[in-house]
Amino acid sequence: MANAEVSVPVGDVVVVPTEGNEGENPEDTKTQVILQLQPVQQGLFIDGHFYNRIYEAGSENNTAVVAVETHTIHKIEEGIDTGTIEANEDMEIAYPITCGESKAILLWKKFVCPGINVKCVKFNDQLISPKHFVHLAGKSTLKDWKRAIRLGGIMLRKMMDSGQIDFYQHDKVCSNTCRSTKFDLLISSARAPVPGQQTSVVQTPTSADGSITQIAISEESMEEAGLEWNSALTAAVTMATEEGVKKDSEEISEDTLMFWKGIADVGLMEEVVCNIQKEIEELLRGVQQRLIQAPFQVTDAAVLNNVAHTFGLMDTVKKVLDNRRNQVEQGEEQFLYTLTDLERQLEEQKKQGQDHRLKSQTVQNVVLMPVSTPKPPKRPRLQRPASTTVLSPSPPVQQPQFTVISPITITPVGQSFSMGNIPVATLSQGSSPVTVHTLPSGPQLFRYATVVSSAKSSSPDTVTIHPSSSLALLSSTAMQDGSTLGNMTTMVSPVELVAMESGLTSAIQAVESTSEDGQTIIEIDPAPDPEAEDTEGKAVILETELRTEEKVVAEMEEHQHQVHNVEIVVLED
């Protein structure tokens, strides 16, 4: 099988002889070729097993180290051009790794999934597993062995998540327990160049400052080469670094431009674009499905980060974040406004409740307060007579309240007497003296009063009567001849005075006694009888069999039982 020729710069190659080959033919000697693809420190030593010497030209590029074991490198000592190295199909790729202060070599073809217990690490002339290597390095307390092992100062997990390194033939052999990144970006899914193409240029990210190592690969035939390409050695897209450095169209190298121009010239651009679109869609669809089935993982974050940086979509992501932030701020402002309005309404409700309670208390106090009826205006009394003394012969009568229907002539009488503890005085007015009953003052009701009349009367007459301050009404009586008034030695039957409510009409019934006993009975009944049928408050008129009846109607008002506008009428048989 024809050999594939790999051309690399001399400064990027380190030749290291293997063990046990010192006395053999140089043509049969195996060597270690170090391709510097990742940033490492100058003068890297690997436990003395490999003699590692980086040329000055390589140290200037700050590139990474990849160990390649080949068969024979012909006549290097004889001055053959070291810029061209022939490698056959038995090439083995190795990575120098570290764990703490310990250093070892990771044999990539033995590094199969899941890798933790696979003997793929060469440490102190022994082939051990990564787990054993971490234990010997004193980092067994770390649960994640991929974080404990570093490749060029970078954690192995980070290298695997970014797609720069993966398990050997991971797409074919996977234990489903690796939990490593299994996505195919353009840089990891690149295939060998099209058959017939002599030279292709690929670029890989090499350092944080954006320096790029170019590997020129020339081959006679892909079918004869049989070389397996790995994502760590070939790439089709220039990836932006983690610092977000963008590659403008002006910064693209001429070789890269020629590469894509060649694809377009052979008519494969449409197919390449379709494949790229399909791969990206499948990649993003897988991320969405994993988000639904399980919590967000680190591998998904690495995929999205690489896609966003590769295609310059970070601005789009920032726009989405800005829109969501604006929506959240608007919602927060609306929430605060609503909360403030609700607090204001609550304060108003509290004030209304307090006002309502105060009004209710005031109304209740008013209802429970005793109602005092205003006193009606006092009416002027009919007359303010003197006390129980004998009035003068000519008392002044300014406002007569009673009208004399039938005047009579009465002989003057000048004597006074009392009966039943009721003071009685004789009123002399010209030739017509009248007996006046003066009752004691006070709010109590006076039940009885007495009048005097002649023993024998032939013609009844009516006289004017002036009631006292405490007597509501005094009725006149039928008198006989004035000559007989001197014989007033007997008292007639008493007069009953009954009170009733203020403002009601009073009826006064005066009845003259028969001529046989010569007595006159005057009854005053101003209050209605409780057992009477008349509901308007009129007094019941008492009927007696008398010769002469007198009917006196008067109107009583107020609690003092005063009577005004009294009409005295004499009725004869």
From Swiss-Prot:
GO terms for molecular function: DNA-binding transcription activator activity, RNA polymerase II-specific; DNA-binding transcription factor activity, RNA polymerase II-specific; Hsp27 protein binding; identical protein binding; metal ion binding; RNA polymerase II cis-regulatory region sequence-specific DNA binding; sequence-specific double-stranded DNA binding. The modification N-acetylalanine is found at A2. SUPFAM superfamilies: SAND domain-like (SSF63763). One of its GO terms (cellular component) is cytoplasm. Residues 321-367 form a coiled coil. InterPro entries: SAND-like_dom_sf, SAND_dom. Zn(2+) binds at C113, H170, C174, C178. Keywords: Acetylation, Coiled coil, Cytoplasm, DNA-binding, Metal-binding, Nucleus, Transcription, Transcription regulation, Zinc. Residues 82-166 form the SAND domain. It comes from the Eukaryota. It is found in: Nucleus; Cytoplasm. DNA binds at K139, K143, K146, R157. SMART domains: SAND. Residues 370-398 are annotated as: Disordered. GO terms for biological process: regulation of transcription by RNA polymerase II. Homodimer, and heterodimer of GMEB1 and GMEB2. GMEB1 and GMEB2 form the parvovirus initiator complex (PIF). Interacts with the glucocorticoid receptor (NR3C1) and NCOA2/TIF2. May interact with HSP27 and CREB-binding protein (CBP). Trans-acting factor that binds to glucocorticoid modulatory elements (GME) present in the TAT (tyrosine aminotransferase) promoter and increases sensitivity to low concentrations of glucocorticoids. Also binds to the transferrin receptor promoter. Essential auxiliary factor for the replication of parvoviruses. This is Glucocorticoid modulatory element-binding protein 1. It comes from Homo sapiens.
